[in-house]
Every structure is written in C-alpha cells, then in structure tokens.
C-alpha cells in the first residue's frame, strides 16, 4: 500500500461542527473552513507521512523511528476502528503539515453506554505558533466530540497549559492522573 490522499475519517464532519457554539475568541477570525491564508484543516491521510507529520509530532514528544509500513498499519487500524480523528493543518503553499491534534472516542458501559472523547497530541510547529492553530484544533475537536454525542471530553496537560485549556470550557478535575510507563 502506498501513501495517498484517503482521509482517516469523513472530512465533512469537520465542516459540520456547530461553530456558533465555539467558546474561544479568535482575532483575526478563523474557523475550520477558513483556518488562514494558505492553510487547510482536514483529516490525516497517509500521504502526510511525506509532508512532515512526524516532524511536527516530534516537537511535542519523542516519536521514535517509524517505518512507512508501521505508519500505514497504525493508520489503517485507526481508520477501521472509526474512533480516531487525527486532524491536521496543512500549509498548502509549502505542502507541509504545520499542526495536528487527535480526538479519540472511548465507548463506555457507564452513562447508558455513552461515549467519552479524549484529546491527545495537540502540537503546532514552531514556525506557525501564534497563528491560533492550537486554539482552532482544540475548538474543532471539542465541538466534534459534542457532535459525535460524547457525554464528556477530557485531556491531560502540563500545569503551565491549564490556563490555555480553560479558555475552551475545560476545568481542572479533582481526580488524579496516574501513569505507569512500560517504555522509556
């Protein structure tokens, strides 16, 4: 299988979010359908492997060495599950991914078999910080989780980022986030 433009999920979902429910302020105004000059907000596709997707992710955390085969296998798994919404912003003039964030849907038995959204891996490339792309991705994925009928959406962040996420209606939970790592 060769990298192509097939999206991980239906791109119309991003256009159908109810932007009137957005709680963040954008100046200048941007939206999922108008993210800025030369920019497109869309689902990840396998061709993004060659558009700097891992370069951007690497600005957030260690990505490790990922072969094209590994990438394709993970992409197909996520696509088939229907519960992964890896979203990117592409600078179409450069043909490069400049920002990404992921919404993952968890299916629960609680709350009448409800769904919970979880935001992961929000990162904007160094060159594009200050263009509100992180805000745009977070607002879009938050509204998408509502459209997908999630009963709540959560995320984990560093203490210095709490203020940023509060702008979108997120609150600090009384629960503790705990982790046990198996890989360093």
From Swiss-Prot:
Pfam families (alphabetical): Acetyltransf_1 (PF00583)
Record-level GO cellular component terms: cytosol; endoplasmic reticulum-Golgi intermediate compartment; endosome membrane; Golgi membrane; late endosome
Classification via InterPro entries: Acyl_CoA_acyltransferase, GNAT_dom, GNPNAT1-like
Residues annotated as binding substrate: 61, 108-111, 120-122, 151-152, 175, 181
Topology of this chain in the membrane: Peripheral membrane protein
Pathway membership, UniProt: Nucleotide-sugar biosynthesis; UDP-N-acetyl-alpha-D-glucosamine biosynthesis; N-acetyl-alpha-D-glucosamine 1-phosphate from alpha-D-glucosamine 6-phosphate (route I): step 1/2
Catalytic activity: D-glucosamine 6-phosphate + acetyl-CoA = N-acetyl-D-glucosamine 6-phosphate + CoA + H(+)
Subunit structure: Homodimer.
Name of the featured protein: Glucosamine 6-phosphate N-acetyltransferase
